[in-house]
């Protein structure tokens, strides 16, 4: 997909690639030749063209591949071949599509994804796209039968280890995904949908207690506190803690919530900032100085805190402990902000540093853990 100068180039989802590969494979099966270009209709009504490759045809079916182009998005699936093998099912009715899992495509092992457990991780929108693309071609040839579609992605199992698939119960490969058919570089919508997906899987898996944290590093600390919780109960918000809390509250299926935040990001959250990205809000020395003064520390401590260039160095001035009024006040402020987004249910806030442990605050107060 081309872009104007200075714009980020869009790409296409694995769902679009699978649709194009399936259409090219069916064309090869019915016509005997692989098309040089294949056009598909996207969910928004637009169209996209692809160049299929690696076409093969035998007595039982045909296969083609389309190489994934994610545009300027840092997508781990970029460059992978998305392949489809199609075979006619003469005993099945018109419109019947049997989706099968090939190499590198994951298997769904948990509920909550809108796909039957045990089935291939081909999401509902790509399934609909493939069904439409093949139906039109069958009509053109006057065929009234079903089609078996086997989707494979060579190298997909290895790439899947770099994704959150295992966390949402997709094992053994990547998912064939996409709601618009397009990859928008650094898409906020796609990022938030990935968080929503982990929340849905947690609920469908029976979790009533969620632990929300920025990522793997903070999760490692929190797992020590909750060793009996399943992996699906740990939700990564990245920097979007506000949106994540909103989704958890809207879901309504959770009785207890623990929110863990590292010290530097906690100074942002305590000010009411709900997007903790450094691009959105930076270090505020005045806020830290104000909090130090408010909690009764000496003038020299306040001035040292104001001069900080890195928040994590605050522990060199005030030892990290729940006995210190500074950290209790910071954690309690963060908990109040979170409570505004999660008004019902039990709520814990955990203030963390990598070196000095954790401070947990709930309705009973704060303590070291």
UniProtKB/Swiss-Prot annotation:
Reactions mediated catalytically: Co-precorrin-5B + S-adenosyl-L-methionine = Co-precorrin-6A + S-adenosyl-L-homocysteine
Statement: the UniProt record of this protein carries the keyword ATP-binding: no
Keywords annotated in UniProt: Cobalamin biosynthesis, Methyltransferase, S-adenosyl-L-methionine, Transferase
EC numbers: 2.1.1.195
Highest taxon of source: Bacteria
Protein name as catalogued: Cobalt-precorrin-5B C(1)-methyltransferase
Associated pathway: Cofactor biosynthesis; adenosylcobalamin biosynthesis; cob(II)yrinate a,c-diamide from sirohydrochlorin (anaerobic route): step 6/10
NCBIfam families, per the entry: cbiD (TIGR00312), PRK00075.1-1 (NF000849)
One BP term from GO: anaerobic cobalamin biosynthetic process
Similarity field: Belongs to the CbiD family.
GO molecular function, one term: cobalt-precorrin-5B C1-methyltransferase activity
Species assigned in the record: Prosthecochloris aestuarii (strain DSM 271 / SK 413)
